């Protein structure tokens, strides 16, 4: 008996637990984001509202507001999220619940240990997380984004301008 899939299989996309766009943002767009973020102050990143220990997370963050200055970034991200969601997960997406988090990992041991991008309160509504690689991987050592499902993990593609989209409930 020759079985056919109920849904057509798209051979030309990455059928994984995450979706990515190599060169999702151009070098010029990345430079615009980096330069535009300079007016906002960094603060030490915390883990939820409990503070932070450098053991779990060592980074600095700033929040880029939803305003006309960043509208083009949000529009581009949402277009990519829509494509990824329709291709892989088909989540019922209603709104954006967070401003854009701009994160800088310090050269001296900067990291963020295994974690979920969901938790109590407003972040319990998160469904999809997005990362945009703002630096050229040749400029630093380490810094791999890894996604774990079950007991296996995958190191996702990285390159300046690469956008990686994944369900917030994955490690």
Residue spans for each PLM region:
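Fe(II)/2-oxoglutarate oxygenase catalytic core
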Residues: 1-163, 169-171
């Amino acid at each position: 008996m020759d079985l056919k899939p109920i849904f057509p299989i798209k051979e030309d996309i990455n059928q994984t637990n995450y979706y990515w766009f190599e060169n999702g943002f151009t070098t010029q767009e990345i430079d615009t984001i980096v330069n535009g973020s300079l007016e906002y102050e960094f603060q030490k990143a915390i883990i939820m509202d409990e503070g932070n220990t450098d053991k779990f997370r060592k980074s600095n963050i700033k929040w880029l507001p939803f305003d006309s200055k960043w509208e083009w970034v949000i529009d581009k991200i949402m277009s990519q999220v829509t494509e990824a969601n329709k291709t892989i997960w088909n989540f019922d997406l209603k709104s954006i619940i967070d401003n854009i988090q701009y994160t800088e990992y310090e050269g001296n041991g900067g990291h963020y240990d295994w974690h979920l991008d969901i938790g109590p309160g407003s972040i319990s509504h998160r469904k999809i997380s997005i990362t945009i690689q703002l630096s050229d991987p040749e400029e630093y050592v380490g810094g791999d984004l890894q996604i774990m499902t079950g007991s296996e993990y995958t190191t996702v593609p990285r390159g300046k301008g690469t956008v990686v989209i994944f369900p917030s409930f994955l490690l």
